[in-house]
UniProtKB/Swiss-Prot annotation:
Coiled coil: none annotated. One of its GO terms (biological process) is fatty acid elongation. Keywords: Oxidoreductase. The gene is ptmA. This is Post-translational flagellin modification protein A. The keyword Oxidoreductase applies.
Length: 256
């Protein structure tokens, strides 16, 4: 589905990013690996090159830096002469992320979370839109979450050390609307923008949480990163050429 398509993946070393890069390569596309962590990036590059017997471009990328974004875009274009799609699966967090409850968080801590994550997604989309306008076409997919679409099921967190972060929900809701706003503003430019809101991704969560979460779903419950990659490939392919401005939910029915 992605033959000869050049796909720039930000956050390539995360669970979803890594799974997506593999899926792109399996579908005969070319994945550009971009991440802020150079050590993880080097490991991923070696792993994928060994598995797929193909030389890949890896780039250090900080989505909160316009200079970093432009440098990465320039390097990608210099190598491939085009970028067909941009997927942002980055997950920038502040030093206190996940450590402080909402009611105890300071203004500065709240702003740090919003600025890094939502601000970074806005900035990255801004720079890729500029590039895609010059190229005369493009495809942007931002990764979001069901937490930006539905209210949390707070009861699932009872008797665990986990919590539902208000900042996270606000960030993801903002990313959803970023996609709709951009898609509408970019009518008649041959640039599509969509958002994928995924259900929870398995990451060694407590069994009590997993059991409660599973009861809210149709068949599996928490998903593996690979479970959402088919939808991402569809959005990156020409099969979805008339899909824009949408937030596609992949959550095994959790939101019902």
């Amino acid at each position: 589905m992605l033959e000869n398509k050049i796909i720039f993946v930000a956050g390539a070393c995360g669970r979803i990013g890594k799974a997506l890069c593999k899926k792109i390569l399996q579908n005969k596309g070319i994945a550009i690996l971009a991440d802020i962590n150079e050590n993880h990036l080097s490991i991923l590059k070696t792993e994928l090159e060994n598995e797929f017997k193909k030389e890949l471009l890896s780039l250090r990328l900080d989505i909160t830096s316009k200079e970093s974004l432009n440098c990465a875009i320039d390097q990608a274009f210099e190598k491939y002469s085009k970028i067909d799609g941009f997927v942002n699966s980055s997950y920038p967090v502040g030093k206190d992320w996940g450590k402080i409850a909402y009611y105890e968080a300071s203004y500065e801590q709240i702003c740090e979370s919003l600025n890094l994550h939502l601000g970074g997604f806005i900035l990255a989309s801004q720079e890729f839109v500029k590039f895609f306008k010059k190229q005369s076409y493009g495809n942007i997919i931002n990764l979001s979450s069901i937490m930006g679409v539905f209210a949390p099921k707070f009861e699932n967190y009872e008797n665990t050390t986990m919590q539902s972060s208000l900042e996270y929900s606000v960030i993801k809701a903002g990313i959803n609307h970023l996609g709709a706003w951009l898609a509408k503003e970019l009518f008649n430019t041959n640039i599509r923008v969509n958002t994928l809101a995924s259900g929870g991704i398995l990451d060694n969560q407590a069994n009590i949480f997993l059991e409660k979460y599973r009861k809210c779903c149709a068949s599996k419950g928490m998903l593996d990163a690979e479970d959402i990659c088919g939808t991402l490939v569809f959005l990156l392919s020409d099969e979805s050429k008339f899909v824009t401005g949408q937030t596609l939910v992949v959550d095994d029915g959790w939101g019902l």
